[in-house]
A protein has these predicted regions:
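Acidic, PIN/NYN-like endoribonuclease modules and their adjacent C-terminal/linker elements
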Residues: 1, 110-155
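Acidic catalytic patch
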Residues: 38-39, 71-95, 102-111
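Short beta-strand scaffold positions
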Residues: 4, 34, 79, 99-102, ...
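Short active-site oxyanion
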Residues: 29-32, 74-76, 125-129
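Helix-adjacent hinge/juxtasegments
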Residues: 49, 53-83
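Short glycine-centered helix-capping/turn motifs at secondary-structure transition points
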Residues: 53, 95, 115-118
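Amphipathic alpha-helical segments within well-ordered protein domains
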Residues: 7, 43, 47, 89-92
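Short, well-structured N-terminal submotif of metal-dependent ribonuclease cores
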Residues: 1-38, 49-63, 146-155
Length: 155
């Protein structure tokens, strides 16, 4: 199972280092998760790049529609409820994390722990990889016992 935060998922829509690796993970058919917070983060990133004239209105519509199609059909969404936020207080007290990063990490930790106790069904021995393209957040995720997938470091 792969949990993608917005920094990693954005590579699916923007031609950046690691874009091909993220595309391959989608094409592999593996189950991909993210927080509903990511919906706002990716829409915001697409709109910001359009406002900054990184692409024209046709590309804006194409990217927005591609994301919305993935959101509806390819991504499993995790709610921001108290269960998913259980690790958040400890994370922000122990590490210098922005609120959004702490939410993403807490949600990924909840997914991993839920898999361990059988809330989510997976293949025997399946684990959760935390997909992130932010080195500081990746380091914290490793310290929290998550496996990390950084698309910028993959070949």
């Amino acid at each position: 199972m792969l949990y993608l935060d917005a920094s990693a998922l954005a590579k699916r829509y923007f031609n950046e280092q690691g874009s091909g690796v993220v595309a391959a993970r989608f094409e592999s058919g593996e189950r991909i998760f993210t927080s509903i917070l990511t919906f706002a983060e990716i829409h915001s990133a697409i709109a910001r790049k359009f406002r900054e004239r990184e692409f024209d209105s046709q590309e804006f519509i194409r990217l927005r529609d591609a994301f919305q199609e993935d959101w509806l059909f390819s991504i499993s969404k995790l709610d921001l409820d108290l269960k998913a936020m259980i690790a958040l207080p400890r994370l922000v007290e122990s590490y210098s994390l922005k609120a959004g990063d702490a939410i993403q990490l807490s949600t990924a930790i909840w997914l991993r722990d839920s898999l361990l106790v059988g809330v989510w069904s997976g293949k025997a021995g399946e684990t959760v990889e935390f997909g992130v393209a932010d080195n500081q957040l990746a380091k914290v995720a490793l310290e929290c016992g998550l496996q990390v997938f950084n698309p910028e470091l993959e070949h």
